[in-house]
């Protein structure tokens, strides 16, 4: 399984997947730079008039609900319809869905009329979508309960998609296979946009890999190992954020192969 992850990582470098992103305004530049550093090609296209047609060109689509506007919402609907019609995978980051019921209604509609292949959120967001009690503070989760794995598996089965929940240990599941990723750095919680950047990387790996379970593990493991490298080189969150992009750029297959800490459940 780890070898498949390394192959997926290498394919991003070889194929330069085009990631069509409709993301939030807080981290849009971070996501674009992270994609470039990883070997992908970012396109931050959110205009309603362009969204359906541009989505046809993408290797994968990344949707982030962090600063949702009315035009973004309409564009997201069109992008998901285009993805369904043109067989383009979609990664969804349901930012703050636990705090904003309208976002949950939108997500239900996206599954109804469009396509979502991967949901990547923090554990609070995932538990909210799965119908579990969740502890959130705005866009942040303060929940790492014992039922986290059950919630992820339940949501994956409900929507027949990959679910990834980030936390102290990151959970990835397709409802049958489940992985716990134990790499990471506490410094990721001290910068804005770490989760958004992981979502963008997930779209890059999913754009070149048929097995979206593997693709999701690849992206999260990449970010976490790069974060471990970065933590050793910096003195605080400001330098950490800048150096993190450098270490994503410098990441090699052997780092994943030798340093990856994954438990298969």
Swiss-Prot record:
Q: What does this protein do?
A: Catalyzes the phosphorylation of the hydroxyl group of 4-methyl-5-beta-hydroxyethylthiazole (THZ).
Q: Which GO terms describe its biological process?
A: thiamine biosynthetic process; thiamine diphosphate biosynthetic process
Q: Which UniProt keywords apply?
A: ATP-binding, Kinase, Magnesium, Metal-binding, Nucleotide-binding, Thiamine biosynthesis, Transferase
User: Which annotated residues bind ATP?
Assistant: 120, 166
Cofactor field: Mg(2+)
Q: Name one Pfam family in it.
A: HK
Listed EC numbers: 2.7.1.50
Protein name (Swiss-Prot/TrEMBL):
Hydroxyethylthiazole kinase
Originating species: Clostridium novyi (strain NT)
The EC class name is: transferase
Q: Which family does it belong to?
A: Belongs to the Thz kinase family.
Binding-site list for substrate: 44, 193
């Amino acid at each position: 399984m780890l070898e498949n992850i390394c192959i997926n990582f290498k394919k991003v470098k070889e194929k330069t997947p085009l990631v069509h992103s409709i993301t939030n305004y807080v981290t849009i530049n971070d996501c674009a730079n992270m994609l470039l550093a990883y070997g992908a090609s970012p396109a931050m296209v959110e205009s309603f008039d362009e969204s359906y047609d541009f989505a046809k060109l993408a290797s994968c689509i990344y949707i982030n609900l962090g600063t949702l506007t009315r035009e973004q919402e309409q564009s997201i609907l069109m992008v998901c319809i285009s993805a369904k019609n043109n067989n383009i995978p979609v990664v969804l980051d349901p930012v703050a869905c636990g705090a904003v019921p309208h976002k949950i209604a939108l997500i239900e509609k996206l599954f109804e009329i469009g396509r979502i292949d991967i949901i990547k959120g923090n554990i609070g967001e995932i538990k909210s979508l799965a119908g579990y009690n969740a502890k959130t503070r705005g866009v942040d989760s303060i929940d790492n309960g014992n039922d986290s794995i059950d919630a992820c598996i339940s949501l994956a089965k409900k929507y027949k998609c990959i679910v990834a929940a980030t936390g102290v240990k990151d959970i990835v599941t397709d409802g049958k296979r489940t992985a716990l990723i134990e790499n990471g750095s506490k410094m990721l919680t001290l910068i804005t946009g770490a989760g958004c950047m992981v979502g963008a990387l997930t779209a890059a790996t999913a754009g070149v890999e048929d097995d979206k379970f593997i693709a999701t593990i690849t992206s999260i493991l990449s970010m976490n190992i790069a974060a471990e490298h970065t933590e050793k080189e910096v003195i605080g969150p400001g330098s950490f954020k800048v150096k993190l992009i450098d270490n994503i750029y410098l990441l090699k297959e052997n780092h994943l192969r030798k340093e990856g800490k994954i438990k298969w459940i």
